[in-house]
Amino acid sequence: MRSRQPLMRCARCYAQAVLAVEMSLTPGRRHPSLYVRAMETFSRTPAGDWYLKRLAPQIDPWLLRLTGGRVSTLYPYTVMLLTTVGAKSGQPRTHPLGYLVVDDGLIVVASNYGAKSHPAWFRNLTANPKVDVLAGARSGTYVARVVDPGERDRYWALALDNYAGFDEYEQRAGDRTIPLVKLERITA
């Protein structure tokens, strides 16, 4: 058990750094650091695209579970493990997703990296809106709903403020409007 102590100490420090970054990314206060700009630039390269689509989804579930949802490979972006119930299979399906914190919940963007179709997790949660989230202090059971068109503009602006690459995804998606999903915590 001693071998995990340094890692957990590191995870706590990392979680504090993530919280500080979250606070700095509050709308109207975003001043991207050189690191954030470099991460966004990298994510738009073929290597970054490969990393986001292939490698991070393999590493992040393990890392997020190990650290209680506090640490992912995509620092400084906040990442959760979203567990949905399969629309056809009825089996639990877990996906690492970036998210935004809003006043009374969390927002996830169903961009599917700009693909012409919605991601599988989006189809699952529209069929079964009760989901589980592993995201540090925000972990819990939530109910999902697709954001109304009236709310979408405000949340889309927040999403673009957090990660400018969503604009490119929207262009790649063509006629598909990228849905935004609001997760609201279920209180016992």
PLM regions: where:
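Extreme N-terminal basic, low-complexity initiation segments
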Residues: M1-M8
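Cysteine-centered motifs
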Residues: C10-C13
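Membrane-proximal basic amphipathic "stem/tether" segments
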Residues: L25-D60
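Short, structured beta-strand-loop surface elements
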Residues: P32, N112-F166, R172-T177, R185-T187
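Short, conserved active-site entrance elements at the starts or edges of catalytic domains
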Residues: G48-A87, Q91-P92
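Short beta-strand segments
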Residues: Y77-Y113
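Short beta-strand micro-motifs in enzyme catalytic cores
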Residues: M80, T177-V181
